[in-house]
Amino acid sequence: MANSQVAEKEKLDAQTNNQDSVATIVTTENNKKNTIPDSEKKIVYSTQNLDLWYGENHALQNINLDILENNVTAIIGPSGCGKSTYIKALNRMVELVPSVKTAGKILYRDQNIFDAKYSKEKLRTNVGMVFQQPNPFPKSIYDNITYGPKTHGIKNKKILDEIVEKSLRGAAIWDELKDRLHTNAYGLSGGQQQRVCIARCLAIEPDVILMDEPTSALDPISTLRVEELVQELKENYSIIMVTHNMQQAARVSDKTAFFLNGYVNEYDDTDKIFSNPADKQTEDYISGRFG
């Protein structure tokens, strides 16, 4: 390679914070863990011609997106592009906003979640949610984890004990907390609180886990632990994660959807999105030229 080409490549790498190299290396490792080819995976969510308004604000426009089971799907895009609105539509949390209205379909396991007869309670049991800020209840760690199972009628202490251990192990935090189960969750670090929230989500045995920027309020070490956990969880769950962190999307996801101005601008395998995007606006965004 000529010296001028080397210099240009180094300049590009600096501009993009090494996104391409991170994506190529890390997603290759991720794909080794995904031994089942995409062609053999079922579609867990199929969004078809979805439009969503907050009053007069047309927040989502003609969204068509198929999300595969046992994948980590990253949703990226600039602020206000519709990322968080989209994942909150997946469990109908958007309906908490009085002015919201929708058109189109979201099929979860082939059933339209907007059907009048579809149970929101059942949907939110099958589809767990982890928010940007850790939000444990002002209760003990034990009571946080057992809240969902108790709500669903489980009262037997032995069964609840087993759920607590299984859930905390699933969130990779059992060894840290097994001797502190009856202390207030507010006394934990931010990273520990977030993993307790993930454990609380696992306690109701969901099929899908939605994560809305789950590490944005965490320190780098806690962020790494949550990312490692996400990789482990995808063996048993389908994970859809909103993130502003391009390197995080490259590290943890199998598929990436780039949202822009309420549209899905591009959706593909993560390594392709980051190393060879089909659209110039996608390339500009992941390269840090806007956002």
Swiss-Prot record:
Membrane topology field: Peripheral membrane protein
One Pfam family per UniProt: ABC_tran
UniProt catalytic activity: phosphate(out) + ATP + H2O = ADP + 2 phosphate(in) + H(+)
Binding locations of ATP: G77, P78, S79, G80, C81, G82, K83, S84
Gene3D superfamilies: P-loop containing nucleotide triphosphate hydrolases
Subcellular location: Cell membrane
Protein name: Phosphate import ATP-binding protein PstB
